[in-house]
Amino acid sequence: DGYMHASMKELMADADERNQPISFEIMEPVGKEFITDRHVLERVAGDLWERMYVTLDVAHCRDEEMVLDHLNKLPRIRKLHLSNRTERQYHTPLGEGVRDFGKLSPDILASGLPIVIEGMDLGLERKVLKKNITYLKEEFFDEME
């Protein structure tokens, strides 16, 4: 925890000096990642917690309950990364995976937070981008009506 806290402190000081916003992202629970939920982030951040900004990536949360918990209890969320996931792959197109956006979209939309759509698209045809745009238009933002 000490090394990570010192690294966070240094990054935050550098960002402040440059007047550049910075946020820390809670990562997916895979072997190499350490900060995988809000409790670990708060513990590691320690005295930095009260002025720290966070990016919430819904694909990194183990289930919808964790997304809602983090959305409602994390202070100072700067933005939301939206993508889906399967049991074996993170950051799949929004309509392809285990994430129930029908359950999440009312809370996400009510938050008023900026939404970032996963930008990973290996082909020049922009298939993932097109799938995400279609899903957002036909399914996700439909909750607003």
Region roles according to the model:
Residues 1, 34-38, 42, 60-112, ...:
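Gly/Pro-rich active-site loop or hairpin
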Residues 1-53:
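Active-site acidic/histidine proton-transfer and metal-coordination neighborhood
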Residues 14-18, 47-51, 73-74, 107-111, ...:
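Alpha-helix C-cap/termination motif
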Residues 27, 120, 138-141:
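Intrinsically disordered, low-complexity regions of eukaryotic proteins
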Residues 126-145:
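C-terminal helical cap(s) of enzyme catalytic domains, especially alpha/beta-barrels
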